[in-house]
């Protein structure tokens, strides 16, 4: 189900796949990058890049580096990992996240993560937290105070952090510094998709 909103936004109530033709100068290799970290067990749901560092969020407890990358080995990482986008070297960014990471957003100086977690670095935060992208420390000034549910999509738009998910209201625009609900989005999102699909949620959106 797709719903168009007044913010020039399209909301997907169920997972969808989007594709577009991109002209390429050469044929893409079947193995375009063999230096990035490997997730042996679990899944990666989202990537975002801040400068020369790539962040990957998902459901995993460790990553390993392929042969030729130094320092190599297996690194314990709780559902989020950061690595050098050019070399694949895993960084010392090690926040402790107690749930799957579904969404990432950054303005270049901060990193927001959306997920199923209830705490980050033992700081109580449900579904949405703001981190220092260099150290992984939680910005305690930011608290969205979500009562329940998870965050599956994030986007910084017009000075607001837009979050979508299963939390009450399903779609919310919060202050990127404090996490307070700005009230910019006041929508009623409800209903069902199919008999057995469960309640409607905002899974992905495009702005």
Which stretches of residues belong to each language-model region?
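Extracytoplasmic surface signature
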Residues: 1-4, 8-207
């Amino acid at each position: 189900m797709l719903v168009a909103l007044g913010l020039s936004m399209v909301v997907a109530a169920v997972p969808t796949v989007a594709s577009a033709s991109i002209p390429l100068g050469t044929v893409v290799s079947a193995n375009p990058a063999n230096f990035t970290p490997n997730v042996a067990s679990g899944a990666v749901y989202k990537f975002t890049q801040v400068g020369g560092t790539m962040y990957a969020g998902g459901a995993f407890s460790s990553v390993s580096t392929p042969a030729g990358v130094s320092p190599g080995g297996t690194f314990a990482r709780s559902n989020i990992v950061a690595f050098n986008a050019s070399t694949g070297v895993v960084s010392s960014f090690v926040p402790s996240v107690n749930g799957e990471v579904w969404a990432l957003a950054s303005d270049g100086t901060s990193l927001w993560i959306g997920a199923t977690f209830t705490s980050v670095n033992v700081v109580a935060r449900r579904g949405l937290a703001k981190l220092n992208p260099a150290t992984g420390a939680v910005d305690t000034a930011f608290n969205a105070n979500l009562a329940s549910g998870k965050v599956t999509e994030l986007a910084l738009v017009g000075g607001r952090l837009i979050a979508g998910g299963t939390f009450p209201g399903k779609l919310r625009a919060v202050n990127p510094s404090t996490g307070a609900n700005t009230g910019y989005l006041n929508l009623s999102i409800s209903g069902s998709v199919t008999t057995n699909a469960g309640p409607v949620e905002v899974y992905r959106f495009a702005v």
